[in-house]
A protein has these predicted regions:
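Extracellular/periplasmic catalytic domains that process cell-envelope and extracellular macromolecules
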Residues: 45-48, 84-90, 121-124, 184-188, ...
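Conserved catalytic-core segment of nucleotide-activated headgroup transferases in glycan assembly
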Residues: 175-230
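Catalytic binding pocket for nucleotide-activated donors in carbohydrate/polymer assembly enzymes
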Residues: 230-323
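C-terminal amphipathic helix plus adjacent low-complexity
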Residues: 2-7, 21-29, 47, 286-357
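Short, solvent-exposed loop/turn segments at secondary-structure junctions
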Residues: 59-61, 97-101, 134-137, 176-177, ...
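Eukaryotic intrinsically disordered and solvent-exposed regulatory patches
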Residues: 38-40, 78-81, 114-117, 178-182, ...
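Catalytic core of nucleotide-activated saccharide and alditol-phosphate transferases
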Residues: 110-191
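Extended catalytic core of nucleotide-activated donor transferases of GT-like folds
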Residues: 2-7, 21-147
């Protein structure tokens, strides 16, 4: 009953946030979700009451060492989703440390194959695992099945080649000092002092960035319409918050919460966005390539009219709650939305259920 009340409350909040956007109705009402809210919320509620996960014992005692992995793993172990009965499980969790060699990982999967019946039923397709950088293809049969069939949960952005779209999931970035959730109907950002803000990051200047990215950043640093700082302290001073794909993306959720519209700078399509099965990213973010320089960037951003800007800003505030990692998971936060993505994958492979002895 409490969860149902929460679902209704969130739906009402969603509608209240969109009221000013719907003053002039359009054929398709704006929503940050790929499916209508009337579909997403009831299905989410069903997930919270029905979804079951069975976790294997790890091959050795270990702890995840990074905050996003630790948050997800601890939340999972203390959640209502775990079951001790593998026959009622929808999915199976395969825990192993990030420093496992290919040979060690192969032996672990081999042992699961030999000691339990569940892997062989689907060749691992109803299993999932956490790997910060993802795992690469390998000629070993066990590792290959894990790579190709099991759902991988990794960091965003992922290592090139280690992510399979429509199967794998990325964790929403974790920001260490999030601000309170932006209030509904936050005033329009028309008096912003800057067109865009970008966080200065040493990693963003590393060799991993393309020359086009570096050139664009250098041009922006010399343009008074863009602000730079080592920490995103007052994002309300800028209409847009700019991110280099591959750079520091930990404050994506923070930007959305305060109503700063996201701009992702990338020279290729992005297929590993967090919550990509749930959130309609084209409604909350602008994607632009770096090759046109600061002139093209300003042309794209200046071409976004007030109506579209306010719609993106409002929808970003709605979606921001799904990027918050709480010490104790709360409905619709990052942990629950990662679980919802797993829930959506429970029917990827169907098989005849029967009792296994």
């Amino acid at each position: 009953m409490a969860m149902a009340t929460t679902s209704l409350s969130l739906l009402l909040l969603f509608l209240s946030l969109l009221t000013p956007l719907l003053a002039h109705p359009t054929p398709l009402q704006p929503s940050p979700y790929l499916s209508p809210p009337t579909v997403v919320f009831p299905d989410y509620h069903k997930m919270t009451t029905h979804f079951k996960i069975y976790t294997y014992d790890p091959p050795k005692s270990f702890h995840f060492t990074t905050p996003p992995e630790t948050k997800f793993h601890n939340s999972l172990l203390n959640s209502q989703f775990l079951t001790r009965n593998p026959n009622e499980a929808h999915l199976f969790f395969v825990p192993f440390p990030h420093d496992f060699s290919t040979r060690q990982l192969s032996r672990f999967i081999r042992d699961l194959r030999q000691n339990f019946p569940y892997w062989n039923r689907t060749l691992g397709a109803d299993h999932f695992f956490v790997s910060r950088a993802g795992i690469a293809y390998a000629p070993d049969r066990n590792v290959l099945e894990l790579k190709k069939n099991a759902v991988q949960i990794s960091f965003f952005p992922t290592t090139s080649g280690n992510f399979i779209p429509h199967k794998d999931i990325t964790l929403p970035p974790l920001h260490s000092n999030p601000s309170p959730l932006a209030l509904p109907h936050a005033p329009a950002n028309k008096t912003a002092s800057f067109l865009g803000f970008m966080k200065l990051d040493v990693k963003s200047q590393s060799q991993s960035q393309s020359q086009s990215d570096k050139s664009l950043v250098q041009e922006m640093e010399g343009d008074p319409e863009f602000a730079f700082a080592s920490e995103p302290l007052d994002l309300g001073e800028s209409r847009f918050c700019l991110f280099l794909y591959g750079g520091d993306l930990t404050w994506v959720g923070e930007a959305m919460r305060v109503g700063c519209v996201l701009v992702v700078i990338t020279d290729r399509p992005i297929q590993d966005l967090p919550l990509i099965d749930v959130v309609r990213w084209s409604e909350i973010a602008v994607f632009v390539g770096p090759r046109g320089g600061v002139g093209e960037l300003k042309r794209v951003l200046s071409g976004i009219g007030d109506e579209r800007y306010e719609r993106m800003r409002g929808l970003g505030v709605v979606a921001a709650q799904h990027f918050v990692w709480n010490a104790t998971p709360q409905p619709y936060d990052a942990f629950y939305m990662v679980m919802y993505q797993l829930w959506l994958r429970r029917h990827a492979i169907r098989y005849a259920r029967r009792e296994w002895v």
